[in-house]
Amino acid sequence: MSDIPNDSIMRWDEETRRFSVFRRPSNKSNGLTRDRQGRLIVCEHGARRLTRTEYDGSITVLMDRFESKQLNSPNDVVVKSDDSIWFTDPALGRQNNYTGYVDAPELPDHVYRLDRSGRAIVVAADINRPNGLAFSPDENKLYIVEYGVLPRSLRVYDVVDDGQR
């Protein structure tokens, strides 16, 4: 679980039924998930990047730029069964002091797909402040929360064979 104000990722221990710190600092982590190999995938608002925590605890930067421009504030993330990583990148984490970092975005709000080779593509560019995202159980639909306009909405996209939406 991410604890953005305390710059921490927390770990739940089922045996003791308590949380403990897994990583601090976490670069103001937000969205977390596991890849198909069980490694932790982290959206880091503060460092403006998507990372993977390896089994030995080291951190691999998966993506911090798109077309030579720095990401905004990766927000939420899901991994598809083909090992591609899909994540939202709204500017929202850079536009207020909640994360402690305020600056102008270099990119518009996007949803990205990062394939196993490390190639990234924009899969949604028409969403104002994309936030949470999830696949349908058969992975044929991608659901994305649009956070930036009222009323907030849930967008649904078809996912096509090449992994795009």
Segments predicted by a language model, with ranges:
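Sequence-structural signature of mature extracellular/luminal beta-sheet repeat domains
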Residues: 1-165
